[in-house]
C-alpha cells in the first residue's frame, strides 16, 4: 500500500497518480491533505524510532516490555494531540479516535508484533538505523512544532532522552 497526495493549495494530481499506477499491483490511497497526513505519520514513527535507538536496532530486546510499549503509545498520543490542537486533521481517518481504547489496543498489538518478530526489523529498525540524520531532523522539526503550538510532550521527551547517542 502506498499513500500519495498533494499539499494544501496545490492542484489535484489524483488522475495522474491513478494513471501511473493503473495496471500495477500497488494499492494506492490518494490523500488530498498530505501535510496533515505526514505530520501524523511522523508522530507515529518517531516513538518507534526512539525504541530502535534505545535497543541499538534490536527491537526484540523489548519483547514483553508492555510498560515501555505503552509509553511509545503515550508519546504518539501526545504528538497526535498537539497536531489536533494546532488545528490539523488526524490522518488516516482511522486514527481520529486516537485517545480511545480501541486505538490503544490496536497499536499495542502492532508494537508487540514488531518486537516479537522480524516485522520490527523490516518496518522500523532497518530504516531508523540507516536514517539517523533524517530521524534527528524529523524529531527536531516535530519538537519545534510542539513548542510553537504550546504542546506538552513529557513522555516524548523522556523516550528521546533514552534514545541515547543516536539523535543529534
Each predicted region: which residue ranges?
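Internal alpha-helical scaffold of NAD(P)-dependent oxidoreductase catalytic cores
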Residues: 1-91
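NAD(P)-dependent Rossmann-like dehydrogenase/reductase catalytic/cofactor-binding core
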Residues: 73, 77-168
